[in-house]
Amino acid sequence: MEAVISFDFQNCFIFILIFLLTFLCFFFFFKKPKDSRVNFDLPPSPPSLPIIGHVHLLLSTLTHKSLQKLSSRYGPLLYLRIFNVPIILVSSASVAYEIFRTQDVNISSRGVTAVDESLVFGSSSFVTAPYGDYWKFMKKLTVMKLLGPQAQEQSRDIRADDIKRFCRNLLDKARKKESVEIGKEAMNLMNNILCKMSMGRSFSEENGETEKLRGLVTESIGLMKKMFLAVLLRRQLQKLGISLFKKDIMGVSNKFDVLLEKVLVEHREKPEKDQGTVMLDVLLAAYGDENAEYKITKNHIKAFFVDLFIGATDTSVQTIQWTMAEIMNNTHILERMREEIDSVVGKSRLIQETDLPNLPYLHAVIKEALRLHPPGPLLPREFQQGCKIGGFYIPEKTTLLINAYVVMRDPNVWEDPEEFKPERFLASSRSGQEDERREQALKFLPFGSGRRGCPGSNLAYMIVGSAIGMMVQCFDWRIEGEKVNMKEAVKGTILTMAHPLKLTPVTRQPPLTWI
Ligand code: HEM
């Protein structure tokens, strides 16, 4: 008898538990968001799967392409849902234009973070900081000092030295008739430049520091999709005490912390004469300034370096790789670039950053590569307040996803959008019309747009411009096969080449005796 009672009690307990769990799941995941009950028209929503909604689309390998298919079928402004979490998907230049023009402040936050205490896009990060006092302070510091004109001038020699080193390395490969993986070479270049510009040092190859840093950046980028999902579901899961992917995220964050703590200690031990010019000095001065508008912490400094390495390296590396790939597939473009460089720079010295303003065609080629292959194809933001877009109502706290990849191939604003035509950027800059330039900026989104747009675009153009300029000026290039395979892949959230670009450099005549 006792056994029967205890059996019934067990069943009853399990039943109550299942009931409670079902109720909680319904409440947190399937209940419609509050605002959708208001009598406003939400944007159209394409068919979705029961319970999970459109989550399968976001988890697909080439998310920007899956979303492109969806928008070409159902329209440029869509209402998607991940369980019951709403997302607004924007896929045309005109809707993106309307949003950036009318809602810039309203969309100047990226939503909650995946894990607050993480150095990787946690609450100390500049990239994920909400639009508020900390972000405003860091933005000012970034634009005026860290990446400002004076800082760029002071760090010019660092970049020139590393471009020369890159060139010598290619010369060595050319002599040995060896091929190079462009992405790997560009990654070394970017890592060296960023380490020296930000910390005044390079990491040592011998004790494996460089490898460790590279590995951490790759690991973080690999985590981006998981982090995006964790961010989307955070408000719901938090109520259940669940923090999605916390272990993975904190694992990388802790490794960054160890590496950066060592950098801070070693920097403090440097003689005073070697301090004062790099980004770390500027950040330490702000940290020690009692009267600063915002009091930053050591964690803010570490998180800023993590932002910098994740935000600046792979994006620039992929731009170098895609640009070279397009040049290899369009030999007439290579010839025109060479003519321009040879006439402006000549054949007796290496191209320099100061030549770049006189090389508009080189600039146009890089812009065209960024248009067709934006390293960050999807731009995530969050609507802070409810608003109206395209006649539809957007509820507050809705995630915004702008498919920059599709906006930059929108046939309504780009002529022959699928073709690689750098000239399109020459025509518009020559017209010099301020309005046209502004409109151009709003449909050309590789660096995002508005106040949360990329503050590193000028630096990126300088590094990518010098690297591509040097490769075109100094070498002929051989590819395996007829054409470069332009198939896409996505690493984390970064758009990359499915088949990494491998080329063999051949020294151009006359020999580069001046390197
Ligand atoms: C070709 C290279 C690069 C590309 C394609 C790129 C692209 C982007 C994009 C798409 C965003 C988001 C913009 C938005 O939401 O509107 C961004 C943000 C950012 N980028 Fe870049 N970036 C590049 C290079 C750099 C460099 C060299 C740096 C710094 C040295 C940098 C630092 C940042 C920072 C700090 C943010 C966050 C800004 C904020 O949230 O206010 N990026 N970048």
UniProtKB/Swiss-Prot annotation:
Its cofactor is heme. The keyword Cell membrane does not apply. The chain crosses the membrane at residues 9-29. The keyword Chloroplast does not apply. It is an enzyme of class 1 (oxidoreductase). Disruption phenotype: No visible phenotype under normal growth conditions, but mutant plants exhibit loss of tropic response to gravity when reoriented relative to the gravity vector in the cold. GO terms for biological process: gravitropism; positive gravitropism. GO terms for molecular function: heme binding; iron ion binding; monooxygenase activity; oxidoreductase activity, acting on paired donors, with incorporation or reduction of molecular oxygen. One of its GO terms (cellular component) is membrane. Keywords: Heme, Iron, Membrane, Metal-binding, Monooxygenase, Oxidoreductase, Transmembrane, Transmembrane helix. Heme binds at residue 454. SUPFAM superfamilies: Cytochrome P450. It is found in: Membrane. CDD domains: CYP93 (cd20655). Pfam families: p450. It is a single-pass membrane protein. Its EC number is 1.14.-.-. InterPro entries: Cyt_P450, Cyt_P450_CS, Cyt_P450_E_grp-I, Cyt_P450_sf, Plant_metabolite_P450s. Belongs to the cytochrome P450 family. Plays a role in the gravitropic response of the inflorescence stems and roots. May affect the synthesis of flavonols that have a role in regulating auxin transport. This is Cytochrome P450 705A22. It comes from Arabidopsis thaliana (Mouse-ear cress).
